[in-house]
Design a protein with these regions (language model features):
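A charged, aromatic-enriched C-terminal amphipathic alpha-helix characteristic of glycosyltransferases
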Residues: 355-391
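Nucleotide-activated donor-binding/catalytic signature segment of Leloir-type glycosyltransferases, i.e.
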Residues: 266-287
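A short, active-site helix/loop in glycosyltransferases that binds the activated sugar's phosphate group
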Residues: 130-194, 385-388
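Conserved donor-binding/catalytic core segment of Leloir-type glycosyltransferases
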Residues: 211-232, 251-253, 374-375
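Active-site proximal beta-strand in glycosyltransferases
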Residues: 69-70, 87-144
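Short N-terminal targeting/anchoring amphipathic segment
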Residues: 60-79, 91-95, 302-303
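A conserved mid-protein helix/loop that constitutes part of the nucleotide-sugar donor-binding site
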Residues: 14, 229-243
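Glycosyltransferase donor-sugar binding loop
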Residues: 251-267, 283
Length: 391
């Protein structure tokens, strides 16, 4: 039997459908639920638990067999003890998003993945600081504050335990070998085998097939980042664009995912965007479903993804699929992968400030004859590996 330790996230149902197609009836799906009802998952095969750890040790651990396998879909401290309790000969795999390996414990890799202005903001406004949830009452926020303090105090212990967990994992399911090498370099003793797998990131959804044809008198529409998180390095990207402030541009900045719309980061980002660009800076604060979100791509001319850490792959592949030009941070493992595959639509962020308005206009109408980026996603290999490792 395959035991999947999962979270209530939007791609969980898609994975379950893939797993059941390749290994029907051979999987149990445990989802940690921190809200009264599931918000993003609907599969009837899911077993929801407030404490997956308690459920595991009372209901599953006594009946484990040596041939069983455990697969993690989001690695946090709630599953550490489960992994460390497993027999040595048992397969333990992680279907990696990378975010769980980079974002926790708090403040571990921020200096590496944030650019100077964003890191200065992080140190002053976010590191070790507690932000109230204004939609909840005082008692709830008091409990949150207690958890916040506990996470800070126990961060060194969490890191030591997490390294031991990573040493126990022997299968690393992921699609980007550059991410895999990042993990090997940052987690001592990690020697898991890389197995090709990619989550469904929605590229089969409705995407604009025929882009809007613009002439050189129309404004240039720029898409900035993918979420309201400091790892987008938004502040630096706005500085890189500032030489275009008087030009015919608009900047669409999606902020409905990540931090709350009234968070310090979101408010200061909007303030900076409006200060430099005025009404040309357009924050998206309302949640859109996937098809609505992708429908907006039709009007976009240019995309900026200033992340250093592995992030926004779904957005990047979707923009590539519809032929958009993307400027990316060169340290990004996704940038490194796309450049290694000779994807011509990708440009380094460091060159953006050297492009004039007219040069960017010309770039957006330039023809690209190579593969569009999504072709490097090997769905057949993904299906073969699911069948191989889950049956």
């Amino acid at each position: 039997m395959n035991y999947h330790l999962m979270i209530d996230e939007k791609f969980t149902d898609d994975f379950i459908a893939d797993a059941e197609r390749n290994a029907p009836g051979n999987n149990i799906y445990l989802v940690s639920l921190y809200t009264p009802l599931p918000l993003r998952t609907k599969s009837p095969l899911i077993i929801y638990q407030r404490s997956v750890k308690k459920y595991w040790f009372s209901r599953i651990a006594p009946h484990l067999k040596s041939t069983d396998q455990v697969f993690i879909h989001w690695l946090d401290r709630r599953v550490f003890d489960i992994v460390l309790s497993l027999p040595r000969g048992m397969n333990v795999g992680i279907f990696s998003w990378m975010g769980d390996l980079i974002a926790t414990p708090t403040c571990l890799f921020e200096k590496e993945i944030l650019k100077p202005i964003s890191y200065a903001f992080f140190k002053k406004k976010k590191r070790f600081r507690f932000q109230k949830d204004r939609s909840r009452g005082e008692i709830y926020n008091l409990l949150l504050f207690g958890r916040h303090l506990w996470r800070i105090v126990t961060a060194p212990l969490e890191w030591n335990k997490k390294k031991k967990v990573m040493q126990r994992i022997n299968l690393f399911f992921h699609w980007n070998e550059f991410d895999y090498h990042w993990v090997k370099n940052h987690y001592p003793g990690f020697h898991a085998r890389l197995v090709y797998f990619v989550y469904d990131v929605g590229l089969d959804s409705t995407l604009p097939v025929h882009p809007i044809v613009k002439d050189d008198r129309e404004k240039l529409t720029i898409w900035l980042g993918n979420s309201a998180t400091v790892t987008n390095n938004h502040f630096e990207a706005l500085e890189e664009l500032s030489h275009l402030r008087e030009e015919r541009i608009e900047i669409i900045c999606p902020l409905s995912y990540g931090e709350h719309p009234d968070s310090v980061y979101t408010r200061q980002l909007i303030e900076k965007g409006k200060h430099i660009f005025g009404n040309k800076f357009i924050p998206l604060l309302t949640y859109l479903d996937r098809d609505q979100y992708y429908a907006m791509f039709q009007k976009v001319d240019l995309v900026l993804m200033n992340h250093i850490r592995s992030q926004a792959a779904g957005n990047v592949f979707a923009f590539l699929k519809v032929g958009k030009i993307i400027f990316m941070e060169e340290k990004s493992t996704l940038y490194q992968l796309l450049r290694s595959e000779n994807i011509e639509q990708i440009y380094p962020m460091s060159e953006l400030q050297h492009y004039s308005f007219s040069a960017l206009q010309a770039l957006t109408i330039k023809g690209h004859t190579n593969k569009n980026g999504t072709e490097i996603i090997n769905k057949r290999l993904k299906e073969r590996n699911l069948k191989k490792y889950l049956q």
